[in-house]
């Protein structure tokens, strides 16, 4: 008898914990997925025999490397870089690069695991990966960021390629960093090829890519509300973060007639009861992308707004969009949101809500969309950037906007297919986990034991 026939969820998770010491976020991500998958595969012997879940929870490979660079004072600095290639059953590895001092191998393994299911959900041929370094771009000069990116790519280039692994941006990696890394890759291999996504539009980037994650999270939110005969118009929203995902989520909420009350960064949050309109969002984008300033400056600029330390979840609103980072919304904060009447939560960030927080939303029957479904618009448009690069064409903003809307609708429908609880409530976590898992698992079955 195959071993997994005798293993229950607790025993399985014990094994995951033992094999991945000191990687709590990875264990948390596997736990969240496994509880749904254990139910789903209970009567499906082929998945047990092939040990599919066990194999998906073990990355294909983890590459770790030294990144040396010289700062402006001529000090030699040493950072650690990684690329986690989790699973390429349905397409080349695909997933962002994160530069943040908190990055560890465990963080990237969790993100690559989530990415595998997310990419599957998009319906596009993309496997899952993630990379990064414990480098802090904050406070560094452009020249320092350039030297770091070049050094990082000097090692990374040998592990990636347009049909092998196609990284993109993530926290701390925006257009500037992608430009420096793409330039270095091209210089080393002497080929122009679509090895990174999120590129500038002058050199092969896709229209709609910068907006796609934030807009997509709002489209998913709109789909959830529509499923219950509701709409975004006239509703208030609390949003965390003030980076790429948060500002574009705020923009789309505003365009659809909602009112955004908060944005944040790691220093605290601003509360603007008048609403953060397009003009103010543009000001925040400039503050963050050009001036590289702090969100607290917003309260100096706009009368009526206030700055507070901590996170924004105590501000009462109908909708919540965590768009900063993992584990930024805990059980108590989820209870506060519920108490204040939140109707729906759509995650722009990856795993921003703790497992306990998710249970609070489910128990209160609040519509709750996990990041792997709600923020998949970014990687979906990255997939479309890969297609455009391969075909040497570029589609316009309008066409890509329509494609993004359709893709998010398709993801929503897959979630409802597997997550409908029969009483009108949809468990989007379960729906996303099962739909994402099934496609990858079936591909792996076709390959045999590899
Ligand atoms: P950015 O670097 O553009 O912005 C990140 C934002 O989150 C900043 O406001 C940052 O504040 C804040 N933040 C980061 N770490 C923390 C922390 N520990 N505590 C509080 N605030 C924090 O990143 P993105 O907007 O691209 O990414 C945000 C989230 O969305 C991440 O979880 C990412 O994985 C996810 N995501 C991004 C995609 C994309 O296309 N960019 C695609 C899918 C998911 P500060 O400036 O102070 O650090």
State each model region's role.
Residues 2-29, 224, 338-450:
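Adenosine-phosphate binding glycine-rich loop
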Residues 200, 205-316:
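Glycine-rich phosphate/diphosphate-binding loop of Rossmann-like nucleotide-binding domains
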Residues 268-368, 373:
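Rossmann-like adenosine-cofactor binding region
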Residues 74, 170-171, 206-213, 238-242, ...:
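Active-site nucleophile and cofactor-binding loops and adjacent substrate-binding regions
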Residues 110, 164-168, 192-196, 262-265, ...:
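General beta-strand structural signal in soluble alpha/beta enzymes
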Residues 1-207, 439-449:
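N-terminal ligand-binding/catalytic initiation module
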Residues 187, 222-230, 326, 335, ...:
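Conserved helix-loop functional segments at active or binding sites
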């Amino acid at each position: 008898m195959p071993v997994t026939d005798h293993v229950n969820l607790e025993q399985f998770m014990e094994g995951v914990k033992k094999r991945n010491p000191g990687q709590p976020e990875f264990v948390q991500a596997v736990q969240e997925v496994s509880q749904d998958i254990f139910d789903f595969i209970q009567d499906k012997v082929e998945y047990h025999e092939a040990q599919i879940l066990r194999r998906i929870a073990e990355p294909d490979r983890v590459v770790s490397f030294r990144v040396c660079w010289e700062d402006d004072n001529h000090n030699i600095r040493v950072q650690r870089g990684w690329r986690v290639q989790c699973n390429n059953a349905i397409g080349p590895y695909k997933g962002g690069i994160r530069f943040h001092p908190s990055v560890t191998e465990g963080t990237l393994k969790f993100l690559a695991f989530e990415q595998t299911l997310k990419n599957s959900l998009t319906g596009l041929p993309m496997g899952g990966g993630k990379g990064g370094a414990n480098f802090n771009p904050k406070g560094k000069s452009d020249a320092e960021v350039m030297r770091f990116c070049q050094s990082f790519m000097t090692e990374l280039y040998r592990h990636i390629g347009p049909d092998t692994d196609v990284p993109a941006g993530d926290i701390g990696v925006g257009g500037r960093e992608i430009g420096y890394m793409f330039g270095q890759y091209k210089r080393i291999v002497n080929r122009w090829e679509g090895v990174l996504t999120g590129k500038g539009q002058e050199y092969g980037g896709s229209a709609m890519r910068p907006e796609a994650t934030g807009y997509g999270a709002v489209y998913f939110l709109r789909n959830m509300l529509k499923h219950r005969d509701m709409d975004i118009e006239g509703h208030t929203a609390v949003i965390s973060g003030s980076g790429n995902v948060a500002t574009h989520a705020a923009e789309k909420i505003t365009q659809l007639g909602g009112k955004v009350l908060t944005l944040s960064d790691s220093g605290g949050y601003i509360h603007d009861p008048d609403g953060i309109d397009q003009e103010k969002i543009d000001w925040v984008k400039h503050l963050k992308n050009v001036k590289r300033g702090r969100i607290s400056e917003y309260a100096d600029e706009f009368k009526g707004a206030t700055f507070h330390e901590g996170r924004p979840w105590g501000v009462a609103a109908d909708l919540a969009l965590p768009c900063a980072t993992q584990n930024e919304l805990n059980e108590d904060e989820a209870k506060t949101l519920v108490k204040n009447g939140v109707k729906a939560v759509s995650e722009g960030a990856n795993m921003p809500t703790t497992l306990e927080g998710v249970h609070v939303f489910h128990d209160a029957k609040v519509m709750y969309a996990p990041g792997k479904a709600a923020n998949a618009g970014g990687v979906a448009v990255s997939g479309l950037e890969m297609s455009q690069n391969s075909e040497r064409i570029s589609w316009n903003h309008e066409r890509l906007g329509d494609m993004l809307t359709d893709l998010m609708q398709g993801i929503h429908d897959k979630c409802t297919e597997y997550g409908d609880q029969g009483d009108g409530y949809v468990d989007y976590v379960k729906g996303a986990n099962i739909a994402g898992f099934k496609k990858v698992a079936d591909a792996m079955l076709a390959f045999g034991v590899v």
